Amino acid sequence: MSRPLARKPPQSRRQQARVNRGRRRQELMTRSQRAVRWLQPGLVVKRWVLTSGLGLLMALVGGAVWADLKPIYWILETLSWLLGTLTTVLPREFTGPILLLVGVALVLWGQSRSFGSIQQALAPDKDTVLIDALQAQSRLNRGPNIVAIGGGTGLSTLLSGLKRYSSHITAIVTVADDGGSSGVLRRELGVLPPGDIRNCLAALSTEEPLLTRLFQYRFSAGGGLEGHSFGNLFLSALTAITGNLETAITASSRVLAVQGQVVPATNVDVRLWAELENGQRIEGESNIGHAPSPIVRLGCVPSRPPALPRALEAIANADLIVLGPGSLYTSLLPNLLVPELVSAIQRSRAPRLYICNLMTQPGETDGLDVRGHLRAIEAQLASLGLNQRLFSAVLAQDDLANSALIKFYQARGAEPVLCDAKGLRKDGYDVTQAPLQGARPTSTLRHDSRSLALAVMRFYRNHKRESSQ
């Protein structure tokens, strides 16, 4: 015989009812706070709601005039009778405030519920509240126009931090890579190397993390697939479908909800070459990174590749131009082999900032300090007939504390990039030093995206404040 179910004690039911009342009260307070936040300036919503309300009022007045004002007379008479009845029951000192509060509450409640329905329809699976998304987008839309030039992991690290400060970001990316998955696709399919572009798209993506991870996924097995990333294959396929990489990037940007734009430095097949101090000449980006002697000069075939109009337009409208961080000879200087890009940077009145690496790279920048990196940039420009200093502001790491991680890198031939700030300032450089590695312990010596972006934005704000004085 089954035992009867035990009834919940009265005390437990009262506690549950108290909890439910607390939850409802908390939900009501949250909704009220969200409703009030719609009144904050800068959302670019209220002006259009008010415009719609004004339009509705004008339409009603127009209809009433068309009907010989009879509807207006009837409405005024009805309101006069209703208000007179209310004031006979309750004094005006009570009636007015009560009607005002009820009206405001209804407006805010209706507004909150209507926008909540819109949010549920547009993005039912996202936890972001519409007012939060609008406030964040409004803040990002007020951000500066930033042009970041480079390639490799350094540029993608910078972009993932900068997207917290602005939605007007343009990444100009080198297309000289000939190693790894990009090199294979370049040789076999004849496409421009998609690897650095893929990294930048993923860094600027605001889509779900799973989609970004899919774009970055690298196959570890399978005949013909091993070593390739899904994003590289995706971009290569889109290039074949659309006919050019630029259109493929635009389509990929929509898929990943990219905040900003990614533009190749050029749309031609560029092959790098380097002259070494020992007189040797080596070809190919992957070989230059392991040069047996210091690099004297960098060049490419064809010698004067054209720039894309979107890149030139972005530089012309830039509020800030950033070069780096990244491999000096294989990620940064290849972009400066495009004469139109260099000319556009020279014409720009925006502050131009060079971000130096944390460590030297064996076979590429052995023994170079910050001044050595700047001299390499100036020497490269001089070889193109340009003697004007292109980047007069420098962002470098504070002195790195000696650690086991630094010793690990030193055992493999890398050294911290030293910065003689006083000497550089005497030479006319604007030097900023900051803790760019971040405070969290890491297994690699790389820039921290948040720390790096914060330092860049502080430089921009300081420059803007000084310029306005």
What residue spans do the PLM features occupy?
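N-terminal signal-anchor transmembrane helix
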Residues: S117-V147
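C-terminal functional extensions of proteins
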Residues: P4, G22-V44, G367-Q469
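Glycine/threonine-rich flexible loop motifs
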Residues: L328-V338, A404-G413
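A short helix->loop->beta-strand "cap" motif at the edges of active sites that frequently abuts
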Residues: S167, S348-R352, Y429
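Charged helix-capping and loop-helix junction motifs
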Residues: N335-V342, D369-H373
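An anion/phosphate-binding loop that grips the pyrophosphate of nucleotide cofactors and donors
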Residues: A318
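Electropositive, gly/pro-rich neighborhoods at or near active sites that engage anionic ligands
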Residues: S2-K126, A176-S293, A455-M457
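Short glycine/serine/threonine-rich phosphate/pyrophosphate-binding segments
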Residues: T153-L159, S181, Y329-L337
